[in-house]
Design a protein with these regions (language model features):
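Acidic (Asp/Glu-rich) sequence patches and key acidic residues
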Residues: 1-157
């Protein structure tokens, strides 16, 4: 499922990163290409079929204003991007065990992201959460054609 969204801070708040710190974090993600004008492309050839997200980072007064993202991705990539935007380094805290997502979410999972950011769905013109977007994405894009029952991440409780 392709997405076209913008990640914004919650009203009255700021995203915790500077343009430069986000550029550094995104530059460390395999397959991510970040340009100094704020544009980025993330291609994951390990996903089947290959997924690609294109985006643009907008900043104002030394802080991130919002990030626009378009393309196709899986839920793990979406979480990785949201975590970077919100200042959380390292891999996502979700781990798969025996084909099922573990029930616990670490403090830097969606619960922490949603205390910092909200998501604007551009085409639909409404606001939602990062976890709601993730619930609409496959765990791996190859699961779009898979008979596996696990094709989506569960929403945190």
């Amino acid at each position: 499922m392709p997405i076209f969204v913008q990640i914004h801070p919650l009203p009255g708040q700021q995203l915790p990163q500077s343009f430069e710190s986000l550029a550094e974090m995104l530059g460390n993600i395999p397959g991510m290409f970040f340009e100094l004008d704020g544009s980025f492309v993330w291609v994951d050839h390990e996903d089947t079929p290959s997924s690609q997200m294109d985006g643009m980072v907008y900043d104002r007064l030394g802080k991130l204003a919002y990030i626009e993202v378009k393309g196709a991705c899986n839920a793990r990539q979406w979480l990785t991007l949201c975590r970077a935007v919100c200042g959380f380094a390292g891999p996502p805290p979700l781990a798969l065990k025996n084909g099922e997502a573990e029930s616990g979410y670490a403090a830097s999972g969606y619960d922490a992201i949603e205390r910092i950011a909200r998501v604007h769905r551009v085409v639909e013109g409404d606001w939602t959460t990062a976890s709601e977007i993730a619930s609409q994405l496959p765990l791996h894009r190859q699961s779009l054609n898979s008979s596996s029952t696990l094709s989506r991440l569960p929403r945190p409780s």
